[in-house]
Amino acid sequence: MMMMNYNFPYYQKLAEGVGCEKEVDFVSCYLSPEKFRLPEKMREVARRISERGKFRVINFKTKSELRKYAVKIGEAYNKTFVNNWEYYPLSEREIKFVIDQLIVNAVPKLYKIILYNDDVAGFLLGFPDISEALIRQKGHITPWGVVDFMLELNRTKWVSLNGAGVLPEYHGRGGNALMYYEMERTMIESKYKHAELTQVAETAVQM
């Protein structure tokens, strides 16, 4: 999955030179699995929320398990970002297309969904970062390049978290604490040495 595009520093001056103004910034945050630790208070909130039983986390072991929840994840994605500046809902056809593309190379253990009773309340989607392979292939897709991309999926030590959210109605009810708790667990328990939280709008203050 492609994450944030890279813009050279001089792009800003060029754009401003023809009268463009900044609308919103999207930021990327580096997280070190070795150093990223939630405050104990937030961990305690997450544990209590889990113990009450209304919120629960679904972990996946196989792609077939993931596919069963794929449509619900797509629907939750639409609802989660409804208040974001760039929000535009995906159609059913677009949801299916995105799901089909993602599941091909999905690492099930990097996908988590949070249920409230039986409804999807939030999700955390992680993707192995194959940027090094893209750099080696200079952006070209060749037969060898495809092999390199596939090998990089297992070789990379970087994971990109580009899909983390809790539906607005569950904010302030423990959903966010549970999501961050799962983010911490995912990074600690995985093989990855580096993590990046990508494409976060500066207006998304709840993050």
PLM ranges: what are they?
Residues M1-K61:
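Acyl-donor-binding surface of acyltransferase catalytic domains
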Residues M1-M2, W158-V159, M187-A201:
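Conserved GNAT acetyl-CoA-binding A-motif
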Residues M1-Y10, S32, L167-P168, L197-M207:
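Conserved beta-strand-loop-alpha-helix junction that forms the acyl-donor binding cleft
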Residues Y30, I113-L115, L125, E196-Q199:
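Short beta-strand segments
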Residues I135-L151, L178-M187, L197, A201:
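Low-complexity, glycine/alanine/valine/leucine- and proline-rich hydrophobic stretches
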Residues V18, T80, T186:
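Short alpha-helical functional segments enriched in proximate histidine and acidic residues
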Residues W158, N162-L167, H171-M187:
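Conserved acetyl-CoA-binding loop-helix of GNAT-fold acetyltransferases
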Residues F60, E65-V166:
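A conserved beta-strand-loop-helix scaffold within acyl/acetyltransferase catalytic domains
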